[in-house]
Amino acid sequence: MPDGFQLGPIFIRFYGIILMSGALAGGWLAAREAKRREYDPEIVWDLLIWLIIGGVVGARLWHVFTPSPSAIAEGRTTIFYLTHPFDLINIRNGGLGIPGAVIGGIIALFFYTRRHGLNFAEWTDISAPALALGQAIGRWGNFFNQELYGAPTNLPWKIYIDPQHRLPGFESQAYYHPLFLYESLWDLANMALLIWLMRRYGERFKSGDIFLVYLIVYPVGRFFLDFLRLDASQLGGINANQTFVAVVAVLSALALLWRHREEIGRN
């Protein structure tokens, strides 16, 4: 499967095009929500630049510090990246972790809103559905890179993986679960839920609640999907991403309950 095309002296990868498309689609959705809340939509496009920078840096660092077993087998360990600066910043072939992207984006958003006198919590709400949409689109970059596929399967929606992209021990297996597709669909459902909650029950939510819902829904889906993942990052024998998202989901649920404890008590 081709993973890009030649444009003069430059090889353009579909992975990068799709990631940028996801960012722009997310920006469009966030701009609509900002306008609905009577903010200047141009704020979103100015902010988006910083979110992309923060997200990419965070995503790369997450990958560097939680390398997958296949990356480690190829010698691309944390120490390798830290001692090879060019490889550290080379993301043309992937190597980005969504948990790190979210963390990096949150940090960038915090400093941007603080600098411009905006309500950080409210802007996390504005950004949440857009983030889910961006993830849903961005996951298709994994399709062209032939990565983030699940266990072997013969289900009708199985995907073929070229031999050079199959993991060690699975060389004879040709068809796999399209794990990227499952996560993309989950992200779309998350986006739809967040938009519905904002429009239907917006007056009941406090600033930051919608983002907390995002931090519950996405991690729950990611937690269960990771059981199908063949090349999950390990730290001390523990699935790093699965453990992290489980902790985030629990803490976010507790935070949401705590913020509405008085209403819950009255009911």
List each language-model region with its residue ranges.
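Hydrophobic, membrane-interfacing alpha helices
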Residues: 1-267
